[in-house]
Amino acid sequence: MSERTSLSRRRLLRATGLSSAAALAGCLGGGGGGSQRVPTDVGEWPPTEYNEELIVWNWYDDWASWAKGAFEKEHGVSVTTSGYSSPNQWYSKLQSGGAGIDNIAGTTNWVERSIENDFLHEIPVDLMPAWGNITDRIKEVSSYQKDGKTYGVPESLVLYPLTYNTDYFDAAPSSWDVLWSDEHRGKIVMWDNSTVSCQIAALYTGQDPIRPKDYAEIEEVLKQQKPLLKTYWGDYEQAQQLFVNEDVVAGPLTMGRTYTARFKEGAPVHYTAPKEGAMYTSDLFVIPKSAPNPIASLLFTDWASQPAVAAKLFETMGYKPAVDISDQLSERDLKFTTWSDDWNLVFQETLSDDVRSKYDEIWTAVKAA
């Protein structure tokens, strides 16, 4: 840990508190600095006793790199960040004990599994000043609570829209049927993801993407679509470059990647939610029960939910924060990040094991066709 020449008043108070608690921490076998305390032990804000280390797993890499320096500067905590490409990477760590992770940004369905398996600390959101910054849209749908207790704080809203080339189309495509049109043969793309692609097909055929009734129809239309496609994409950067290079003109791509393609690489692209609907979900900050520095993690979660900090998520990654940042954005970015009230948006609830299995079977059959 780097040496510092001065202590802020907050850190001085924290150091004083630690010295008075050292004997107790030693008796408990802890490492000091609040490692024996859990988030619900915090009785006032801000917490004055916490370790000076923090280990963060967050797949918004550019934001996490910025947050590391900013949080270290503001709170005197040494932050280690790690990215991940698939949620099962951190989930499997929690299954095996989860040692070494203090704060995770996880998707809703994996957070729900973690709650059910008692992997997460309860978070005292009523004590956190920044909790009031979280928008009602995501508070009302995100599955981060159980038995009246809160286990996650929403970080972002993730939309799975239809991205399209604005030079090719005179107006935003109004339907997912654009991905089944022979007119665009060889110019459209689909995500190599069983859940996303099957849910798009479910929406296209007028079904509930969470609880579909006609799996045969979903499989049939996906097989019909296959010869029309330029390719399936499996890597986010690959998909982004397909649009940047104008190899494709329409297909599913995340809002964040669409933003990057448009404003950082100059691609003529935008996104929309077709009339049949589009899926969206949330990523949430969670604190594992095995976290070595849970109080520092709680402090980080509140800090990250401040508008100025959350705005950096949009600025660096193009994703919509769970916090209202409208007063932090330029007119251009505000227009890009605003979702129309007319859109039919479907929250991505956790799929049942049966639906998930059926979607996997369908996708295997489609890819083999």
What are these regions (language model features)?
Residues 1-20:
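N-terminal secretory signal peptides and thylakoid transit peptides that target proteins
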Residues 219-225, 265-289:
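Periplasmic-binding protein-like
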Residues 100, 104-230, 237-244:
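Extracytoplasmic ligand-binding site segments that recognize negatively charged/polar headgroups
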Residues 111-113, 251-268:
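A ligand-binding cleft/hinge motif common to bilobed small-molecule-binding domains
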Residues 278-279, 283, 288-346:
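Mature extracytoplasmic/periplasmic domains
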Residues 38-113:
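Early extracytoplasmic/lumenal segment of secretory-pathway proteins
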Residues 331-369:
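Extracellular/periplasmic bilobal clamshell ligand-binding domains
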